[in-house]
């Protein structure tokens, strides 16, 4: 109790979550699918969907069927596994060389770690505002008089995006997960003048000529 702490001349640091990492308010925020974590899935044509982890104490991507296509690409690698060429496909051209990879925006599925909900979309200001309203503002409603006194602050525990993945070797055929959100490409274009979706293969493979991809930085 606050009064007991005051009597003992102790401070009360508040915690804003029921477990690590902060953001979902114990799954309350992410009952609204709009506020769930999103991620980009980049995968080769015909790849089998990976097994879902039974238990996961992290904000790693949780695969689901809730996704939509962002784009498809024809990829050609050289003998060393470097990116020789690629093109964004608007229409399928089955007789051309190369392998087809596709990028999907996927919404996080349920996981027991977040009370059978999902982690929050930390790239969405509205989602985080909802988290603050449910947690920090609720604390303030109850203990406003003690903020800045007995209560010096609120501890937020490592909010994060989904974990970024890479291929273990350039010819590996598996899905690669990257942090992403609904307006990521629009925001990127406004800031840098080109679409990140046009350059997704450069985030996965090294260029054949050894040049550094501007899109990575």
Specify the residue positions occupied by each region the protein language model found.
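Mature extracytoplasmic enzyme cores
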Residues: 1-217
